[in-house]
Amino acid sequence: MTLNIGVIGTGAIGRDHIRRCSKVLQGSRIVAVNDINRDNAAKVVSDLKLDAKVYDNGHDLVKAADVQAVLVTSWGPSHEEFVLAAIAAGKPVFCEKPLAVTAQGCKNIVEAEAKHGKRLVQVGFMRPYDQGYRALKQVLTSGQIGEPLMLHCAHRNPTVGEAYTTDMAITDTLIHEIDVLRWLLDDDYVSVQVVFPRKSAKAFPHLKDPQIVLFETAKGTRIDVEIFVNCQYGYDIQCEVVGETGIAKLPEPSSVQMRSGAKLSTEILTDWKDRFIDAYDVELQGFINDVLAGKLTGPSAWDGYAAAVTADACVAAQLSGEIVPVTLPPRPAFYNK
């Protein structure tokens, strides 16, 4: 059985997902493509030698009879309207983050999906599909180290461009930890504080870097996340869980260990795409399999909404320097199915 997919947005991530679905994964076929720049969409179809129709309008693509599922990889502010259109059409939709650019936009999607009565939305949070995070989750679920008491995490990038701003440390960078740590702990955040250490001389004048984000969860677990986007040395993701009877740490990516010139060394990756490339494959294959099986199991619209509410609280904490509550309404029973 093959799933016919339409893709809205053929920028870098859209093009990569089209390549992935048409050349790497099993059970899918790209039958429709749309982009605000029609020539760009046509070029992707030509370059990848696809038998796919190029649509001038994303809404027409969603309504197309041969499109069974939709990937939304367009400009962030357009995500909400296309996800809502897919829900209205009763079609499963995979939406790259952000689900919407505001928490209210995410809530609109949650309400529309609940009204439809069936899960149709998966959000593009890929870290729960990473082999290392899955292994860490398995350790926590097994109870081998008891209940998690504290987490020490870091998200480090070698450099960022001059357009990167202080709030983007939350909305572009920390957003991944916001999602994956909720999933890892099966817990929600109740408060957040952001503190700023001594500023790195490598950061642009307008950017506060590094930052430390301090969370408390509903179960009382404390989390500290270091965000350092000008660390220079590489792309480095760390996560250490301190439990009642032991410590579990996210494994490092596989790398050859070298002994040479009186030094023992291993390589550190420099690009986030290399660090999580396999997770992207597993994530989209999971979406395809779930749609064909008739039940989505990946990150939900509720997860996207929770991430947006938490990110808003983090940005408020950046500005105030105070402990800011993270206020989520009760999760609808619809998402407990």
From Swiss-Prot:
Reported EC number(s) for this entry are 1.1.1.18
Which enzyme type, at the first EC level? oxidoreductase
UniProt entry keywords in alphabetical sequence: NAD, Oxidoreductase
Q: Determine if Cytoplasm is one of this entry's keywords.
A: no
Cross-referenced Pfam families, in alphabetical order?
GFO_IDH_MocA, GFO_IDH_MocA_C
Organism's domain of life?
Bacteria
Q: Which InterPro entries match?
A: Gfo-Idh-MocA_inositol_DH, Gfo/Idh/MocA-like_OxRdtase_C, Gfo/Idh/MocA-like_OxRdtase_N, MI/DCI_dehydrogenase, NAD(P)-bd_dom_sf
The record lists the catalysed reaction(s) as: myo-inositol + NAD(+) = scyllo-inosose + NADH + H(+)
> Is-annotated flag, keyword Chaperone?
no
Q: Name one GO biological process term.
A: inositol catabolic process
Q: Report a single Gene Ontology molecular function.
A: nucleotide binding
State the oligomer form and interacting partners: Homotetramer.
User: What does the UniProt function comment say about this protein?
Assistant: Involved in the oxidation of myo-inositol (MI) to 2-keto-myo-inositol (2KMI or 2-inosose).
Question: Which protein family is named in the record?
Answer: Belongs to the Gfo/Idh/MocA family.
Name of the featured protein = Inositol 2-dehydrogenase
Gene source species? Serratia proteamaculans (strain 568)
